[in-house]
Amino acid sequence: MTVYYKGFPQSDRNEAIKMVNVDELEDRVRKVMPEAAYYYIASGSENEWTWRNNTAAFNHFQIVPRSLTNMDNPSTETQFMGMDLKTPIMICPIACHGIAHKDAEVATAQGAKAAGALFSSSTYANRSVEDIATATGDSPKFFQLYLSKDWDFNKMVFDAVKSAGYKGIMLTVDALVSGYREANLRTNFTFPVPLDFFTRYVGAEGEGMSVAQMYANSAQKIGPADVAKIKEMSGLPVFVKGVMNAEDAYMAIGAGADGIVVSNHGGREIDTAPATIDMLPEIAAAVNGRVPIILDSGVRRGSHVFKALALGADLVGIGRPFLYGLALGGAKGVESVINQINNEFKILMQLTGCKTVEDVKHADIRQINYTADNLPSNTDPSVRRAYPVTKENQMEGTQDAATGASKH
C-alpha cells in the first residue's frame, strides 16, 4: 500500500473510497501522508481566514426549493468549450501530485476520466503532459501555466501541451510570489518528488525546492499583453485564473481571454481576500456571458456546486479533496470524490426541479447576512493537533521534516 521515493512514502492504492462526505477524508489522509506534505495541501496563508471563509461563505446563499415540477432523473451532463462532460465539476490544477500517490497526475487524470470530469494539469506536475495524455487518451484536459520569465521555456511548454492534445491553458495571475504559508514554514516543506518541466528544460528537478523558491522561477509581473502573446504562441484558448473583481475581468476579456477563473488560489495567497463565491455575482455580471466562467476555492459539497452555477459559473473546480482521494484510493479514489460531490449535486437538482445543468443556472438563490466560520486554522497554536504517527506516513530509514516526515 506504500512505496518510497528516496525515503518519501507514496500511496500505491487504487480502490474506491466509501465516505459520507468529502470532509471526512481530511482526517483519514493524515494517517497515510507525511505531516509536511499534508500541510502543503491542507493549509492556507497567514491566519488562514480566506482559506476558512471560502467554504463558510457558501452559507451566505440559500437555495430556494421548488415543488410540483413534474420532473425526475436530472442529468448532470454538460458541454464546455466543445467538450462533452458528465459533470460540471472539474479537477483544479495543483502542483506535485506525487506527494499523494506514486502515479501522481496520471492517476488523477484517470480518475477524472472515469468520472467524466475535466482534468487540469499544473506546470509544476510530476508527470509529463505526454504521460498523462497516453494514459487517458482524448479525455478532456486543460493545462495550468505559471508563466516563466524565460519565453523559450514557455514556448517549449506550449508546444508540448498542444501536441499532447490539451484543449486550453489556464494562466495563473494571482500567485506572482508565494503567499506567506506558515504551516509550510513550520514543517520545512520542500517538494520531495521531481517536477517534469524542470527536469526536461533546465536539468533542475525541482526536488528539494520550497514553494517560495519554485515561484521565484515564474514571472513576477503579468499584464494584458502577456495574455495576447500566450494565445498567439500557443494557438490554444487561454483562461485567466485568479480573477477576483469586475475590473480584472474586463481587462482579461479585453486582452483576448477566452475564459475567466474566479479563484483566490484556495486561500493560499492573500489572507483576508474575499471568498470566491461572494465575488462571483459581481464578476458574472461584468462578464455578461461573453466568455465562460470557472469558480474554485472552498468547494466541498454538491450544494456549493449548485450555488456557483446558479450565480454565474459554467464549471466548478475542486482542489484539496481530490488529492485526499488520490492518497487514499489512487485513480478510483479521485473518481469517488468527484462522484460523491456530483451525487449530492444531482439530489439538489431533483429537489429544485432542475432537469439540466442549464436549468441550474436559472435557479432561485437568495443572499443572506450569515456566516459559519467554524473551521479551525492550521496556524493557530491553540488548536493545532498532534499529527498522527503511523507506519505509512513516515520516511523510510530516516525522519526528516524537510522532506515531509514527522518528528515526535
Swiss-Prot record:
Ubl conjugation as UniProt keyword = no
Q: Which InterPro entries match?
A: Aldolase_TIM, Alpha-hydoxy_acid_DH_FMN, FMN-dep_DH, FMN_HAD
Question: Where do the annotations place pyruvate binding?
Answer: 40, 146, 181, 265, 268
Reaction equations catalysed: a (2S)-2-hydroxycarboxylate + O2 = a 2-oxocarboxylate + H2O2; (S)-lactate + O2 = pyruvate + H2O2; 2-hydroxyoctanoate + O2 = 2-oxooctanoate + H2O2; glycolate + O2 = glyoxylate + H2O2
Which keywords does this chain's UniProt record carry? Flavoprotein, FMN, Oxidoreductase
* PROSITE patterns, per the entry: FMN_HYDROXY_ACID_DH_2
**Which residues hold FMN?**
93-95, 122, 144, 172, 241, 263, 296-300, 320
Cofactor list: FMN
Q: How does it assemble?
A: Homotetramer.
What does the record give as the function of this protein?
Oxidase that catalyzes the oxidation of a broad range of 2-hydroxyacids in vitro, such as (S)-lactate, 2-hydroxyoctanoate, and to a lesser extent glycolate, mandelate and 2-hydroxyoctadecanoate, to the corresponding 2-oxoacids, with a reduction of O2 to H2O2. May be involved in the utilization of L-lactate as an energy source for growth.
Stated name of the protein: L-lactate oxidase
The species this protein belongs to is: Lactobacillus jensenii
